[in-house]
């Protein structure tokens, strides 16, 4: 193998490994189009938290986006379906049950709901994660801890 070919193989391997690590860590090099639209169109007037705590379905997000456009939000017509799909995927409905409102109002103080959705875990793992959050200052009461734990363990567990 020539020196140039060897260098090329090393560079391709390093790039592939870096891409794999980035994807494995759940980090995109660039936000997706829906997130870009949301940041440009929604968060110019609203704090992201207002979006995070709603957890709406497709019809409700469609109505919300239409209302905001009527009130002056600048969302290009072709971007509306992309924005709605993003909102449903990342800020869509959460399963009903005891603990839902606590998750919506407490966990979203620091986390996007998509973080909860993608972190499927066993009950023990959720307990550890919640304990870590408490140690980092999450405003979760002793009374609410088991309610949230039960909600997460029931609805966001490995398949």
Predicted features and spans:
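Positively charged n-region of N-terminal signal peptides that target proteins for export
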Residues: 1-7
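Bacterial N-terminal signal peptides
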Residues: 7-20
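Electrostatic cytochrome c docking/interface patches
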Residues: 22-37, 50, 67, 77-102, ...
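The canonical Cys-X-X-Cys-His
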Residues: 39-48, 83, 104-114, 148
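N-terminal, post-signal-peptide region of Sec/Tat-exported proteins
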Residues: 49-79
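Short cysteine/histidine-rich zinc-coordinating motifs and their immediately flanking basic loops
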Residues: 54-59, 119-125
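Short microdomains enriched in Cys/His and/or Lys/Arg
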Residues: 62-73, 127-139
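Surface-exposed, polar helix/loop patches in the mature regions of secreted/periplasmic/lumenal proteins
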Residues: 90-118, 125
